Amino acid sequence: MKSVGQHFDEWAPNYDAEIREMVPRYEEIHDTLISLLSVRPPTRVLDLGAGTGYTLLRVVDALRETRVTGLDVSAEMLSRAAQRLAGHEDRVELCQGDIVEPAIEGSYDAILSVLAVHHLWSDQKRHLFGRVWEHVSPGGLFVVADYFRHASALLLELYELPEADAHEAAHDHPDTTAEHLTWLTAAGFDAVDVVWKYEDVGVLVAWKANR
C-alpha cells in the first residue's frame, strides 16, 4: 500500500484539475476561508497540507500584508506550489513535513487546513488540534475545510460512494462535524462553529480568545 506522500506525489500532475471535479463547490470553500481571514487580516498564516499551493495563493492575493507558510508531505505537490507562487517568494515559505506530527515553530495568527485532516485517524486529529492550539496566537483562529462523515445513516446512504478505492479505504478517515467541534473545544479553543457546509464537505472555525 502506498503511503499518503507517495499517493500525492503521483497525483500532483493532475491534482488541480481533478480536485475541482471531486469536491463540490471548491471555490466557494475558499471564498468562505478568505472571508473569515479578512475580518481581522492575519500577519502570519500556516497552511497544513498545502498541496499545490492554491489556498496559499488565494491568501496572498487577497491579503497583501500577510506572510504564509505551507507544510505538505509531498515533495511533488510542493514543487508545483513553488511554481504557482513564483513572484511571492518574499511572503511565502514552503516546508516538507507530515501533519501527523507537524514541525511547527513560533505562533501564527491563523492556521488553516484544507482537505487534509480527513487523512488522520480520530486520535491523530485530537493530537493535532492540541498542537495547533499551542501555536495559534491569542485572538487567532484555526480553520478546517474538509470532508466530514455524516452522522445520519440515511445521509451516509445518500452521499457516500458505495465502494471506496484502495487509497480511500486505507487513508481517508472522516469524522463528523460534531466530533471535530468537541475535539477542538477539548484542545482549548474558546469558540467553535460550522460556518459553511454542503453535502459531505464543510468549513469549521475555532477561535482562541485573547489572554
Regions found by a protein language model. Give the residues of each.
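Residues lining the SAM
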Residues: 113-117, 145
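Conserved class I S-adenosyl-L-methionine
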Residues: 1-39
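Class I SAM-dependent methyltransferase SAM/SAH-binding core
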Residues: 46-48, 52-101
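A short glycine-rich, Lys/Arg-flanked "PGG" loop and its adjoining helix->strand segment in the class I
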Residues: 126-138
